[in-house]
Amino acid sequence: MSYPVTSQPQCATTSCYQTQLSDWHTGLTDCCNDMPVCLCGTFAPLCLACRISDDFGECCCAPYLPGGLHSIRTGMRERYHIQGSVGHDWAALTFCLPCALCQMARELKIRE
């Protein structure tokens, strides 16, 4: 004889925590706040991307992989609890790559 399931098992306690999301310390267009980073992002963006990847703790070749920079930027947002979305990350890196790289480099300098 089988007994019908009338309710699903539930957790006795729920632990919920909220983390406060913050903004990037500098804006996307604040490139001139750090002139060496600005120059590197303008004239050697792949070198800056490799440095960002290395400083973030990833392989320095990650920016050369498809989606590598996107995953680093998204990982940076998640690690530092910066508000935004994958779509915003994609748009920043697709339409304004040098500015996005400079913003990421400045954020790492400030946070580390």
From Swiss-Prot:
Keywords: Cytoplasm, Keratinization. One of its GO terms (biological process) is keratinization. Its main location: cytoplasm. It is found in: Cytoplasm. It comes from the Eukaryota. The keyword NADP does not apply. One of its GO terms (cellular component) is cytoplasm. Abundant in the cervix. Moderately abundant in the uterus and fetal skin. Expression is markedly increased in psoriatic skin (18.5 fold increase in comparison with normal skin) and its overexpression alters the protein composition of cornified cell envelope (CE), but does not affect keratinocyte differentiation. Expressed in the granular cell layer of epidermis in uninvolved psoriatic skin and in the psoriatic lesions it is found in the upper-spinous layer. Belongs to the cornifelin family. Part of the insoluble cornified cell envelope (CE) of stratified squamous epithelia. Directly or indirectly cross-linked to CE proteins loricin and involucrin (IVL). NCBIfam families: A_thal_Cys_rich (TIGR01571). This is Cornifelin.
